[in-house]
């Protein structure tokens, strides 16, 4: 229950920031995908069925505020969660460096999938035009990943959750 409350609060704050930041920054592509960072953190460091449902719920919350296709972000965020879970178990590591790599690839995956599905694959030949913006957003989000991981680790300690070894 504490994990659910911690990440629900984190997702709420992340959603507010994701709504406000594009209006405050000079370019909207600099707005990081904070909810995706939380989903990666859940997948790597808090394995379980409840966390998969929580990742889906966070994606659905993103859909309600900014999704074109209802349920698409929920699906994509759940897939990123599962990828983070799988990779952390296969490589037996929950290091921050691996989290940064997963976040970088996760942002690229979700943005490209959103673009292709929302355009009904009609604009696939124009994908090369938006790739620079996607890569910039992925890099900026990846740069913020260690800070978000530290904040979630701090929150986990505050509420008394079990800590997983980061460099297993």
Labelled PLM ranges:
Residues 1-168:
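Terminal, non-globular segments
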